[in-house]
């Protein structure tokens, strides 16, 4: 399934935190691969191969804690019951992110300019950048005699680090969702020829709410274009 987001062309928005505990191997195929992997595979292809039931044969549980109150837990499982293979993973990760302090921001400058006019300050500086992140990953695959059903769901929520107006604000949330589902059949003949008909669905979704300025901030406006402030909003 597609790793690169069709919106940005990059894999670093959704898969930058993909759990390595669920990766069996990484394939790097150099050179053009458009005939097999689509029109964008004109220089190389990187395939991420995840574990199947026979690779795991049980349950692996891992977790960690680190700087900036970073915590995560990961479960990888796989088992064969007769001719039925079941495998998957569940993972949670949260971090407060970099705790850098912004001493002054755009709203600080506006507050300074408007203070003689009696406007109350609204800047949240000095304050921390908004670099938190929270992620859920779920994957499940069931296979029987070459037939299989598989699904993946990734949900990310994060802060923007700082607002697009270079001001501290505390109500922003950048949410990214990725989901795929697939039903198919795979048959290999003498390890040289494989047939794999399949039906699949991929969806990338962005739900962003970015607070440009903190509550109570005032914006000087030049409504008539003469270079002078004539309105404060």
What are these regions (language model features)?
Residues 13, 41-43, 64, 70-72, ...:
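Transmembrane beta-barrel architecture of outer-membrane proteins
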Residues 25, 30, 45, 60-62, ...:
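Membrane-embedded beta-strand positions in outer-membrane beta-barrel channels/transporters
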Residues 141-157, 176-233:
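Face-selective signature of the C-terminal outer-membrane beta-barrel domain
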Residues 12-16, 28, 40-64, 71-77:
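N-terminal periplasmic accessory domains that precede
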Residues 2-30:
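Short acidic/polar hinge/loop motifs at secondary-structure boundaries
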Residues 2-5, 33-36, 95:
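Short beta-strands and strand-coil junctions in structured, solvent-facing domains, enriched
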Residues 8, 55, 64, 76-173, ...:
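Periplasmic-side early beta-strands and strand-to-turn transitions of outer-membrane beta-barrels
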């Amino acid at each position: 399934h597609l790793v690169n987001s069709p919106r940005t062309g990059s894999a670093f928005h959704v898969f930058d935190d993909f759990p390595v505990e669920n990766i069996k191997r990484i394939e790097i195929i150099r050179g053009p691969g458009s005939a097999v992997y689509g029109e964008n595979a004109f220089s190389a292809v990187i395939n991420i191969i995840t574990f199947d039931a026979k690779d795991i044969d049980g349950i692996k549980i891992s977790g960690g804690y680190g700087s900036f109150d970073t915590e995560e837990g990961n479960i990888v499982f796989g088992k064969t019951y007769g001719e039925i293979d079941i495998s998957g993973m569940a993972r949670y990760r949260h971090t407060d992110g970099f705790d850098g302090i912004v001493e002054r921001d755009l709203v600080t400058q506006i507050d300074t300019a408007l203070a003689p006019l009696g406007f109350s300050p609204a800047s949240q500086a000095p304050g921390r950048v908004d670099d938190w992140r929270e992620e859920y990953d779920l994957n499940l695959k069931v296979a029987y005699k070459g037939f299989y059903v598989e699904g993946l769901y990734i949900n990310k929520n994060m802060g923007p680090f700082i607002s697009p107006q270079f001001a501290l604000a505390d109500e922003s949330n950048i949410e990214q969702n990725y989901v795929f589902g697939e039903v198919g059949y795979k048959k290999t003949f003498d390890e040289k020829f494989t047939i794999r008909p399949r039906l699949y669905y991929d969806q990338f979704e962005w739900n962003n709410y970015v607070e440009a300025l903190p509550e109570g901030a005032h914006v000087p406006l030049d409504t008539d274009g003469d270079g002078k402030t004539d309105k404060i909003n």
